[in-house]
Design a protein with these regions (language model features):
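Flexible glycan-contacting loops in extracellular carbohydrate-active proteins
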Residues: 99-134
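Short tryptophan-centered beta-strand motifs in secreted/extracellular beta-sheet-rich domains
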Residues: 17, 72-81, 87-89
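Surface-exposed coil/turn segments at beta-strand junctions on protein surfaces, enriched
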Residues: 10-12, 69-71, 104
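Short, isolated positions in well-ordered beta-strands
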Residues: 64, 96-97
Length: 138
């Protein structure tokens, strides 16, 4: 299980993460992206795991952002407005989620693949990323 961390820590402004992610069939119970940093009891503002071929929000397997995500490239955009305290998630250009963040003073983007042990996870943990970019509006 590997995850990349964008080393830029931010505490204000509007920040956008974008990239193309490919999740092979058989990967389940794996988070592919998160915005780290939040007030306790949370560790992250947003977490996007894949369960049974569905991109979900946190560990809520009923909060599906995209279905049939296996074996295809998917464009993911995540916009975090720190002052407003909200996050928008776009999948393939379509707005799929608007949520309040979980606070926190410092944040950073983390992406790749890492296990989430709250539901049965698969032995296969794999995700491929390309065209990753970070944008900011101070």
């Amino acid at each position: 299980m590997h995850a990349l961390i964008m080393q830029k820590v931010y505490s204000s402004g509007v920040w956008q993460f974008e990239g193309d992610v490919y999740v092979p069939w058989g990967t389940s119970g794996a988070s592919v992206m998160q915005i780290f940093g939040a007030n306790k009891p949370h560790a992250s503002t947003v977490m996007l795991p894949v369960y049974d071929g569905k991109l979900t929000y946190y560990h809520n397997v009923t909060k599906v952002l995209a279905d049939r995500v296996y074996d295809r490239w998917m464009r993911l955009n995540v916009v975090h407005d720190v002052a407003a305290g909200n996050v928008a998630v776009f999948v393939d250009g379509e707005r799929r989620l608007d949520v309040q963040g979980h606070g926190g003073k410092e944040h950073y983007f983390k992406f790749g693949v890492y296990t989430q042990g709250l539901h049965n996870h698969s032995h296969r943990m794999e995700a491929h990323w390309k065209n990753v970019a970070i944008y900011t509006k101070p």
